[in-house]
Structures are given as C-alpha cells and as structure tokens.
Regions:
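Active-site proximal loop and beta-alpha junction motif in alpha/beta enzyme cores
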Residues: 1-70, 75-264
C-alpha cells in the first residue's frame, strides 16, 4: 500500500531550519506498533498521522520512541499540508486530537495554531536533572514540562547536559525547557527530553504553552517574539488568550512522496 507522506520544516521561512516533521496521510488507522515503526524510520523529531473520518481530520503524533499527547510543530506541519497541498482554497482546518480540538488558520503572513494554556508553577528540580546541568537555573517551574529560567541568553546557548545522568529520569510525555530573556526578542529557549532518541528538539511548540504565560506575566506583554536557539533555530510569535496559547509561525515543504506500508 502506497501512502502519501510530506516532510515539512515548521516555525521557519527557510528550508533546513525550524523543526522538521513528517505528515503521513492514512485512509484509516493502522496498528499503533506500525505507526511507531514508521515514525522511527522517518527519523525526525515527530511524525504526524492524519486520518479523514466523518468529514473531520483526526491527528496523532509519534516520536521515534512513543506516542505523545501534544506536538506544536507537527500540528503546524499538518495544517500546512492540508491548507497548501490538500485544500488550498481553505484558510483554516480543525484537527481532532487526544488534547481536544486544535485549530490551524492561515493569513497573508503566517499560520496560527491554538494550543492549551499551561502556566507553570514553582517546583523542585529532580537530582537527575540538576546534576546533569553544567549551570544551575535561577528559577524552577513545572507544568507538563519543567521550565528552567536562566539569567541570560548566553547561559541558555552555552548550557551543556550530561546525557548519562539526564537519562536516569523518565518524563514522558514531557521534557525540560531552558529559557531566558532574549537580546533581540522577548525570550529564547531550548528543549530537552531524557531517554529520547533525539535529546534536543529543534523547535518545540508545545513547550511554549508554558513559556508564553510565564514570560507574558513577567514582561507584562500580550504579544511576544520568541526564538528557540537550537542548532537549526526557529522563530515564533506567541500570545495568551484565556485558556489558550496562540502560536504564529511559518512552514515550508521539503519533500512530497509515498511510503510503502505492507499489509500484515
């Protein structure tokens, strides 16, 4: 069975930057074990699987290791595929997901995705995280993910993690966001997941569900410009609107093709 697949760089206007996601279009759901094999074979941070059922798109996300409950950049990539390749006459699409309905809209300049607002609260840092860090944070908070706040952008950029120690803890489906005020934007971040095939995520939309409310309150701003300073880098505009976080970003298609899924 030949199945359509798209590879998209999300939260960027340029190829080979942002965060790459694969979007696989399925006629119906196949066993979870096979979804995981496809995600592992794709070897990108996340693969989004789409099924049209009853006139609605149903969306699931897989890393090379597990199914996860939310993925911002793969949702943006899926929205880009639908609105650019499948239904270019439309400007919005809704996805049914384990985290509820997620909307992706397109205007003249960017895509907008609405994700759950997850304000972080003060927390204790597990020793397997603190001992793995080359520099301790000024502040520790937690929602789904741990949020570690540093004094400067350079501290975030230079931070090193001892993977052997870091991998002693399992935070599925969460991870660790490290953040600081930015020099030429409102805030910067990096994101790490222990025990994951890909430890540092290039751009993490879901982490901004907690980063955005934190920095919005701290800076007293509604609209924030953010950069994730991974090796690929990515840019987002973020806003808190009630129980949602609005993320604005671009996406570009890298490849279009088919994969072979043999019948069992």
């Amino acid at each position: 069975m030949n199945t359509p697949i798209y590879q998209v760089d999300a939260f960027t206007e340029r190829l080979f930057s942002g965060n790459s996601a694969c979007v696989v279009l399925l006629a119906e759901w196949i066993p979870e074990s096979k979804l995981l094999k496809i995600a592992k074979e794709n070897a990108v941070a996340e693969t989004a699987f789409l099924v049209m059922n009853g006139g609605e798109y149903h969306l699931r996300w897989f890393t090379p290791d597990i199914e996860i409950d939310l993925c911002g950049h793969a949702t943006l990539a899926a929205g880009h595929v639908v609105l650019t390749h499948l239904a270019p006459d439309k400007n919005a699409v809704q996805f049914r997901t384990i985290s509820g309905q997620l909307d992706v809209e397109r205007d003249d300049t960017a895509y907008r995705i609405a994700l759950p607002n997850r304000p972080p609260v003060p927390a204790e840092l597990p020793s397997s995280i603190s001992e793995s860090l080359s520099l301790q944070p000024q502040e520790v908070l937690k929602a789904r993910d741990y949020v570690l706040v540093y004094a400067s952008e350079s501290q975030v950029a230079d931070l090193q993690i001892n993977r052997e120690i870091f991998d002693r803890i399992n935070l599925d489906p969460g991870g660790v966001a490290v953040t600081a005020a930015g020099r030429d934007c409102d805030f910067v971040s990096r994101f790490f997941t222990p025990q994951a095939t890909i430890m540092e995520d290039p751009v993490t939309g879901s982490a901004h569900c907690s980063l955005t409310p934190y920095w919005s309150e701290r800076l007293g701003k509604k609209s924030l410009e953010a950069r994730q300073i991974s090796h690929r880098g990515g840019e987002l505009r973020c806003e808190v609107t009630g129980d949602q976080v609005q993320l604005f970003g671009n996406a570009v298609t890298y490849s279009v093709g088919h994969i072979r899924i043999d019948e069992d």
